[in-house]
């Protein structure tokens, strides 16, 4: 990691200019803006932290893969628990472990609360649904996006980081199951 926000690494040199422009508000030249961009610049300290951590990326991904496989082994095939399908030919970074609780014996919020009792902090990603944010509520209704509304209430992202132990993954799964 590079402290806050992250970094981009890629193999395709043609992406360099595009990514530079996107991280600089979409500016492509003097008084020229071609893309909807953002302020994606980092300071020198963040860059140094990112460079120091870059050497650990492959090992961290390998550790996360082992942990993800354990979650899949324990939670896969359980009725009412849906895991994201992995696609052939895709190289995953195993950054997140999202789980959808749909028709399981406990709902997402009950699982969240049960884990919290054991000081295990899962995350309710995509919640609340973006069109329920105060700044959008008057323009949009989550009733207009029923699938997003449902998924926002069912997804729980379980802890997944390189130093997490298999024993802790098993404890998390035991609490859920």
Language-model features: locations:
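PLP-dependent aminotransferase class I/II
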Residues: 11-177
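Glycine-rich phosphate-binding loop of ATP-grasp-fold ATP-dependent ligases
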Residues: 3-8
């Amino acid at each position: 990691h590079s402290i806050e926000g992250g970094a981009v690494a890629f193999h395709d040199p043609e992406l360099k200019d595009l990514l530079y422009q996107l991280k600089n508000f979409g500016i492509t030249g003097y008084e020229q803006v071609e893309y909807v961009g953002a302020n994606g610049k980092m300071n020198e300290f963040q860059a140094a932290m990112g460079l120091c951590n870059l050497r650990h990326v492959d090992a961290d991904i390998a550790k996360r893969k082992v942990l993800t496989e354990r979650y899949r082994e324990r939670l896969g095939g359980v009725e009412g628990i849906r895991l994201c399908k992995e696609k052939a030919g895709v190289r995953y970074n195993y950054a997140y472990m999202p789980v959808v609780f749909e028709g399981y014996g406990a709902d997402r919020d009950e699982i969240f609360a049960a884990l919290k009792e054991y000081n295990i902090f899962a995350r309710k990603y995509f919640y609340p649904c973006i069109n329920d944010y105060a700044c959008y509520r008057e323009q949009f209704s989550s009733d207009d996006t029923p699938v997003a509304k449902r998924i926002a209430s069912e997804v729980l992202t379980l802890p997944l980081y390189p130093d997490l132990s298999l024993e802790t993954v098993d404890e998390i799964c035991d609490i859920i199951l």
